[in-house]
């Protein structure tokens, strides 16, 4: 059985948290506003995985009203969600992620992001695709007010 999941997340710049994408700390003049570490890649991926497995969403599993998730490393959340999904017999086929941001450029960090995901999900880096794009200065992302991420996953059981 094939199961497809889709996840989306967005965070606003302007907070005091460092910019973390895919578990990688990226130098940026702007911080992120968030309850956890604000990692849009991890959050959209968790939502995609949970969706494919019909296990709800990140907000239900890790509510931002719970103080224990304040400042938490989103890689930890990913590992918890993935354990729940694999306990149901799901296997990961592939991941496709698009990070949408005007600044900063992240191409030099993509290999490290893929490595983190492959470690956390116990899969090959060849099952993970990560790319970045801009909005050509349009909208809140184009004005460098925030970043977004879309993740699509394919699971089998």
UniProtKB/Swiss-Prot annotation:
Q: How is the cofactor bound?
A: Binds 1 divalent metal cation per subunit.
Alphabetically sorted, this entry's keywords are: Isoprene biosynthesis, Lyase, Metal-binding
UniProt catalytic activity: 4-CDP-2-C-methyl-D-erythritol 2-phosphate = 2-C-methyl-D-erythritol 2,4-cyclic diphosphate + CMP
Name the GO terms of the biological process aspect.
isopentenyl diphosphate biosynthetic process, methylerythritol 4-phosphate pathway; terpenoid biosynthetic process
- Stored CDD domains: MECDP_synthase (cd00554)
**Cofactors:** a divalent metal cation
GO MF, any single term: 2-C-methyl-D-erythritol 2,4-cyclodiphosphate synthase activity
Give residue numbers for the site Transition state stabilizer: 35, 134
Residues that, per the record, bind a divalent metal cation: 9, 11, 43
Q: Please, which domain of life does this record's source organism belong to?
A: Bacteria
Q: In which pathway does it act?
A: Isoprenoid biosynthesis; isopentenyl diphosphate biosynthesis via DXP pathway; isopentenyl diphosphate from 1-deoxy-D-xylulose 5-phosphate: step 4/6
EC number(s) per entry:
4.6.1.12
Assembly state and interactors? Homotrimer.
Family that this chain belongs to: Belongs to the IspF family.
| Function as written in the Swiss-Prot or TrEMBL entry | Involved in the biosynthesis of isopentenyl diphosphate (IPP) and dimethylallyl diphosphate (DMAPP), two major building blocks of isoprenoid compounds. Catalyzes the conversion of 4-diphosphocytidyl-2-C-methyl-D-erythritol 2-phosphate (CDP-ME2P) to 2-C-methyl-D-erythritol 2,4-cyclodiphosphate (ME-CPP) with a corresponding release of cytidine 5-monophosphate (CMP).
Q: What's the protein name? A: 2-C-methyl-D-erythritol 2,4-cyclodiphosphate synthase
């Amino acid at each position: 059985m094939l199961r497809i999941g889709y996840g989306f997340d967005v965070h606003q710049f302007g907070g005091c948290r460092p910019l973390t994408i895919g578990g990688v700390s990226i130098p940026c003049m702007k911080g992120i506003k968030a309850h956890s570490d604000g990692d849009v890649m991890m959050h959209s991926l968790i939502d995609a995985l949970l969706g494919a497995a019909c296990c709800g969403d990140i907000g239900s599993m890790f509510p931002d009203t719970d103080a224990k998730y304040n400042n938490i490393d989103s890689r930890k959340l990913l590992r918890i969600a993935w354990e729940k999904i694999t306990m149901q017999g799901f296997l990961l086929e592939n991941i496709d992620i698009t990070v949408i941001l005007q600044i900063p450029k992240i191409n030099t960090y993509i290999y490290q992001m893929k490595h983190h995901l492959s470690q956390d999900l116990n899969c090959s880096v060849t099952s993970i695709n990560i790319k970045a794009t801009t909005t050509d200065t349009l909208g809140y992302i184009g004005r460098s007010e925030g970043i977004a991420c879309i993740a699509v996953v394919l699971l089998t059981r």
